[in-house]
Curated annotation (Swiss-Prot):
Keywords: Disulfide bond, Membrane, Signal, Transmembrane, Transmembrane helix. Residues 31-71 form the P-type domain. It comes from the Eukaryota. Its main location: membrane. The gene is TMEM190. It is found in: Membrane. This is Transmembrane protein 190. Disulfide bonds join C33-C61, C43-C60, C55-C67. Residues 131-177 are annotated as: Disordered.
Amino acid sequence: MLGCGIPALGLLLLLQGSADGNGIQGFFYPWSCEGDIWDRESCGGQAAIDSPNLCLRLRCCYRNGVCYHQRPDENVRRKHMWALVWTCSGLLLLSCSICLFWWAKRRDVLHMPGFLAGPCDMSKSVSLLSKHRGTKKTPSTGSVPVALSKESRDVEGGTEGEGTEEGEETEGEEEED
């Protein structure tokens, strides 16, 4: 797991660092042109002051006709450190939880709760799209088939004498010899 996380973090740092041209050092020690320009050291001498392009090529800052050195930006550095801490913590938590579940499954400690373990019975659920909406469908008298077998007549509540065939005895009848 960490084998995937470390290259991903490295790629993130590389992409972020390539934006300002400082590489990975720009992530840990970002430079900025923000702040008061008068208390900074001049950069490039008179030629850089006369040519703003030369000033910027020297990776200096140019504002109001003054070419000056960049300063480390502590606010951006703090934000980068927090991003790095949260990313590493998330990767560590993910790795540990995967290892914990793998260990628990190998030791057969991980069990599904009882209400989730059984098969899914969809007959009790009500579908909003179904036409019947959970009502029990009972056959009407017109839709009952005419020829029913003996078992189905007994189940449907037929009387005791109705289901007998010729040659069978019922409890209340006696055979005449």
